[in-house]
Design a protein with these regions (language model features):
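SF2 helicase/translocase NTPase motor core
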Residues: 1-26, 30-140, 146-150, 181-190
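Short charge-dense sequence patches
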Residues: 93, 123-127, 159-169
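Conserved helicase ATPase motor motifs in RecA-like P-loop NTPase domains
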Residues: 28-29, 151-167, 174
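Short, functionally important structural connectors and interaction interfaces within domains
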Residues: 20, 139, 158, 167-168
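PAPS/PAP-binding and catalytic site of the sulfotransferase fold
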Residues: 37, 69, 165-176
């Protein structure tokens, strides 16, 4: 399918390309995935600034939506991907493939970082549904925070950045910018 982006989509793609730490807060159905994939395509296959991208998403979105979006759009032809869901053996096999984009469900972030035995050598991380990282006490948050300094580029995607109020924002932004905007410690933010 031919991609004819709206102005806001072009703006968001350009923002991701120009800012190594970015977030796209758009309602469902407004094209967060294609916006991000367009930027990934450019970073991986045009400017060669990124070699490996990790997309973290809810299980169904990781298994179905991201692969469908990559296959759907003509301008993304050539962008290779692997979906790392399922059993441990299936996830490892998917993560060992030589592709540009690795898609994993958020429940397996801790496994990937701490237990998989694979190096965390992703240049770019995309967190689809950033609000699922709102708890600073969650294992997935802590695991991702450990490897965050190794990541050159990160993008957070969500339609509901503060689903339960402003306290939810701290952990989401801590993972994105390592505490630059809202501080490194939750007690100070409170």
């Amino acid at each position: 399918m031919k991609y004819s982006p709206h102005k806001y989509q072009t703006y968001a793609t350009d923002f991701i390309l120009e800012h190594p730490v970015s977030a796209v807060f758009l309602d469902m159905g407004l094209g967060k995935s294609v916006i991000t994939l367009t930027a990934i395509f450019d970073l991986c296959l045009d400017s060669f600034l990124v070699r490996k991208v990790l997309v973290i998403a809810p299980l169904r979105v990781a298994a179905d939506t991201w692969p469908c979006e990559i296959e759907k759009w003509d301008h993304l032809r050539g962008l290779t991907y692997s979906v790392a869901v399922g059993s441990e053996a299936q996830r490892k096999a998917a993560l060992l493939q030589r592709v540009s984009v690795y898609i994993i469900n958020r429940e397996n972030v801790q496994w990937l970082v701490e237990d998989s035995g694979l190096p965390f050598d992703y240049d770019m991380v995309v967190i689809d549904e950033l609000s699922s990282f709102k708890s600073y006490q969650a294992k997935r948050f802590r695991a991702l925070l450990k490897v965050r300094p190794r990541v050159k580029r990160i993008v957070g995607l969500t339609g509901t950045p503060s689903s339960n109020g402003l306290m939810d924002l701290w952990a989401e932004f801590r993972v994105l910018d390592m505490g630059r905007r809202l501080g490194r410690f939750i007690t100070r933010y409170r």
